[in-house]
């Protein structure tokens, strides 16, 4: 299984609980996602002026980009209550009914990993989202009867890392779909600098840049790296985090200049050395690395693709010349036109 202790995993870890202090409290403090942020501000202002519930919102994007933070900000900007849960926690229709019937007018209900809701729960959610009603079956057999329960008008905010797993009826009920993208180095520098101020740690511009460059476009990882580099700076009695301290700390933590860790380098090296740079199927890679396919597709590969180290093709995974250069390996000779011919997703 993917090691949850990976410093650069975008998934939540136990030590990320300290991130709460680093999170922005409103849209004006939120760095990055400019278009999404601007549109959200318009929709929130309009709903507030009309004193109506905001349309249902769906946040789509890789882990660690701020979906939960934005959901909390939406509720805070609207001045309403906030309830949070996740798809796997809502095991049956009764669990969802208990959540919905306890919402006040215009409250925000946040469901993380909404793509993991069961079909039975989704069926109950549809009329709740559309008509603000619950249609429940009470009893069993001939004595069973349908009961309608009126709900307060609420806003459902869903978050998913895998939009393709959402059913069309569920996706279509979200009036405000918002896609979140990886952050630029400049945006992450601002996030790191703000985080250092919140933590009471001095940091230079080049120190913030060094951490930002290795944060894989992800604020959650930037905050995690900042906390670990701060430990190295404290141990060295340094007044501030500069590039030298950041480089030393991240090198000791095996996070290289491109933000790759040992798992990333192992993935790339396996394709390069064992399969001649590819193409190689994802199932083969899953077996070679003893990792589940989902972990490879959702956690390992997105950043490698973003950086231009990897292509997904109909024939399998294919390393780019950039990947061989990063690994310090000679690129094998390929058939003319083999690289870059296939831009689609792997089918197998």
Curated annotation (Swiss-Prot):
Residues annotated as binding ATP: 22-23, 64, 67-69, 130-132, 173, 183, 220
Location of the region described as Large ATPase domain (RuvB-L) in the Swiss-Prot/TrEMBL record: 1-183
Free-text comment on this protein's domains from its UniProt entry: Has 3 domains, the large (RuvB-L) and small ATPase (RuvB-S) domains and the C-terminal head (RuvB-H) domain. The head domain binds DNA, while the ATPase domains jointly bind ATP, ADP or are empty depending on the state of the subunit in the translocation cycle. During a single DNA translocation step the structure of each domain remains the same, but their relative positions change.
Subunit structure: Homohexamer. Forms an RuvA(8)-RuvB(12)-Holliday junction (HJ) complex. HJ DNA is sandwiched between 2 RuvA tetramers; dsDNA enters through RuvA and exits via RuvB. An RuvB hexamer assembles on each DNA strand where it exits the tetramer. Each RuvB hexamer is contacted by two RuvA subunits (via domain III) on 2 adjacent RuvB subunits; this complex drives branch migration. In the full resolvosome a probable DNA-RuvA(4)-RuvB(12)-RuvC(2) complex forms which resolves the HJ.
Record family assignment: Belongs to the RuvB family.
Protein name: Holliday junction branch migration complex subunit RuvB
Region (Head domain (RuvB-H)): 257-348
GO CC, alphabetical: cytoplasm; Holliday junction resolvase complex
Binding site for DNA: 293, 312, 317
GO molecular function, one term: four-way junction helicase activity
Record: residues binding Mg(2+): 68
